[in-house]
Amino acid sequence: IAVTPTVKEELPALAPRPYPFDSISRRDPQCRATLLADTKARVYDGKWESHYDRLRYGLYPALTATSATDGARRFEDLWESNYFALGLTQADFVRQVTPAALRQFMTDEQVQPFLIELLGDAERMELFLANVKPGDNLGNALRVWARLANDDAKELKGKYANLQVATALVFDQKFSFARARDPKHERFTVDALERYRYFRDNAQRQRLETDIKKLAPYELVWVVSAEATNEEMEWALKENDLRKLKLANGDQQKDWSEAYPMINYRMDFVTGAKPPKAPPGKKAYKPLAESFTRGTLEEILEVGGICMDQSHFGTTAARAYGIPAASVGGDGNRGGHAWFAYLMPNHQWNMGNGFRPFNEPRNLPGTGRYADGYANGHTRDPQTGRGIGEFEVQLTGDPKRRMKSHYEKAFRLRLAARVYAANTDQEGRYACLRFATHAAELSIDTWKEAAACLEDLGTKADHERWRSFLRDMRVAFNVSDEDKRWPDMLAIADGYAEKHVWTDPKMTPEQIFKECRQSYEVFMREKKRLRGDTMDKTRYDLIVVAAERTARQLAKDTTPKGQENLFFYLRHALQDNREHLPTFRGLLDNFYAAVKGNKKLERFYLEEMRRIYVREMEDTGNDVFRMKTVLGLIDVMLPYFGKCDEPELGRKLVHDKEKIQKELEKLKKQ
């Protein structure tokens, strides 16, 4: 049971004055010594609010005394002072962890020594803070980090700090998983220390494919989050076929992309038909009903599976070898699909797509993604548990991220911005954040923090200011470079524009329509430019977003003429993207909302929907995946005929549905 420790030395009294960070104080070793002594006292007495106030009020004059004309280099001289660096990182550390969470350790003798050491180390605090994300439980993360650090032998101290931070931020919440093919649906809970020891000890024994010590925490979260037991991962390290794979920057024999097709595809799992003949050296395959196992990596390799099994195997096996990897999924013309992605030795990701924003090698091997409308992938952030776009993963491969003159500088400017905010100086905060966006142009977090600051400024941030900000944002994400353009970020910029620019009363409806339609036209021009690669690279998902955004602007004109304009716009959007089933499906509801209540347009809508369906989607070509996808589409379409009180127009779809269902039943008997 934890007890309150006896503090032998007398704790320094809590002074009311701010800590001084002027030029003289920054060179005075006594100032740093005082801060360290006070910090230690706060660990025991928990008076963190007063400590934070003394820091934020003391740091602010030092920051404002610098010259704004120095731009992104504005605070570099300040950072040369260890005392200043300690004060600024401490301030943000206390703010983010919160005084309430820090008080939890007042009676925790296991964490207190670690916390005192950490609060005296600006570099380690900065490492931690730079990798924190919204939603992290930082109190729990610190408790986990202390446990990991305390487990290291003396000769290992400091060697695995990045691994410790990544593990702490992933395991700040209970980490558990269930195997997809386990009939018992048992959940396995992974212990943070056990997971840390697996990677630390195997790194020491040089059994991993990567040098864990050289990977950053934002990369290592894609390693320690393996949804497997340690026994499974130990099996992977010993499995002969996996041991033959090598991590490479390009396509070569036995590279890690081959982990995906190592799992034999079981079409009978999809159709319910009789099992195929097993490959040489494997046991005879059993029917689907008898093929369920506990779903371990070893069993998946033995039994085979479908794309989700291939993705899970490739991702988890890579992580077992210390390779950052992600299981990615998307929606295309043949339904949902899963593939995987992994980090190459050059710290860039092989996403299995054709996007090469950082001049990645052209000969990258595939990772299971189909060239059939799967240009957009999604995965789950292992640190927060939330779904994210694959572009957020690929952006971490920015070569500038590992350069101190870019992302580190930008983060330090963000730390300064938070001090300005704590002193109610929003303009100073915004200036710091804009310098930060110049230092790290492709940092999503920096741009979002700057946008949040503009929103906090309220009416002080007028439409022109927002327009200038978004212009810079689009330039940063290469709006004019067709080969390096980040379309997701352009969509995010449009979201801000809809909220803060297109609300300008000086803009006419025609001007707003022209601006909001621009992104839609950019994506459509891109599709035409790609030609043969259309289905492989076109971001149909963002075409839907752009079309919906344009439709919202047109819908503001509630006159009959306005409704007619909206109808024809959405009709063109549906026609322009008829080859991609998910896009067609995604536009239907907006199209219906545009015609609802107008019987003439409702009938036009139903006829147009049915016409495109018959022309583009009726023929499933005996492709079981396409059949199931079209079946799902019919289920989406049929209710619209009822809503428009035209059930007879939908009779053909009812007939097609019955036909596809019969064909799928036949496949089960083969």
Model-derived features: positions:
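Intrinsically disordered, low-structural-confidence terminal and linker regions
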Residues: 1-64
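A structural boundary/capping signal
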Residues: 6-17, 316, 449-452, 488-490, ...
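Acidic, low-complexity protein-protein interaction segments
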Residues: 22, 45, 53, 60-70, ...
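Secondary-structure boundary elements
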Residues: 69, 79, 83-301
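Hydrophobic/aromatic-rich core segments of domains that either
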Residues: 289-297, 308-396
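Soluble non-cytosolic domains of exported or imported proteins
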Residues: 301, 305-309, 624, 628
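Charged, amphipathic alpha-helical linkers/stalks
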Residues: 357-451, 455-458, 462-463, 467
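Extended amphipathic alpha-helical coiled-coil/heptad-repeat regions
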Residues: 430-670
